Amino acid sequence: IGNIGTISEVVVRKEERRLYLLSGERVVRDYRISLGKTPEGHKLYEGDSRTPEGSYTLDFRNPNSDFYKSIRISYPSAKDRELAEAWGLSPGGNIMIHGLPNNVGDMAFAYKGLDWTDGCIAVTNEEMDEIWQLVDVGTPIRILP
């Protein structure tokens, strides 16, 4: 992977379908991503298939998820919970950065360029290996429209 320094922040630009790894102010890696099936707008409630927008933290790593590795985003925040509960809804949770479904087999190509998740941020398995290696728990993530 080379000497790229410590990853200080992850930035997602939903409109561009890009995830950037930053070391200080410098972008050291960027990836094409897939989002939730309803990509526009902030996640409001469980089941809306949206990817949240805002500032969060990467707070947990799961090597044994239903998808190829996953790193959890600290959604919902207190504000997210308050917003959903005002409508009498659950904000949802378990929003992750992850690879492809574990059972995808030869169909991996079918996911490329599509927004197919329930709100998570997906990359290829090879890219997930790299992100897994470079990004520590506690790293801030900003998800922009």
Question: Locations of the language-model features?
Answer:
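Well-ordered beta-strand positions in beta-sheet-rich domains
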Residues: 30-32, 55, 94, 140
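N-terminal post-signal-peptidase region of extra-cytosolic proteins
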Residues: 1-9, 14-15, 35-59, 79-83, ...
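A short, polar/charged loop/turn motif at coil->beta-strand junctions and beta-hairpin connectors
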Residues: 6, 27, 52, 65-67, ...
